[in-house]
Amino acid sequence: VVVYDHHADSAERFCGWLEGKCTSAQRAVDLEQACRDADLVVFATTAATPYVHDASVFAQAPTVLHLSLRDLAPEVIASVQNITDDVEHSMKANTSLHLAEQQLGSRAFVAGTFADLASGTLQPDFSRPRVFSPFGLGVLDLAVASLVLDAATKAGTAMEIPGFHIPNLSWSS
């Protein structure tokens, strides 16, 4: 795992937290170094406005999970394959996709949705970066819920509600 943060001390603390949780964690000195050889790039920031204006940081055509939704400038969004969970919902609140729509005057830069990808009606374009912006999916909500459930189960305080959870599905079966 390669970690970059505008605040070096935050990156160092996160690398320390990752120690023992993954094979290795190192701090990058800049965003370009962090992205250079990555197959997967995850943006999880508190950025209120885009700060990534140069798409060349994704020259190796990675998959980009854009959780924080406001990191990428419209010119970057226009140059990648954009996939979102809900096109309408993602075009609000000055997200990167919303700003691109305002600048470009259309939504033609959105290739499709996660459902399109899952159903096979949309194929990933591996010749360029693929950016997934999950604005309405509630990914962080699910992660926190999973953490709480795991902790409650481990502590013996979880209450099972029969039929509430769908059993894990295997994509290989």
Give a label for each model feature.
Residues 1-4, 30, 160-164:
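Beta-strand segments within the central parallel beta-sheet cores of soluble alpha/beta enzyme folds
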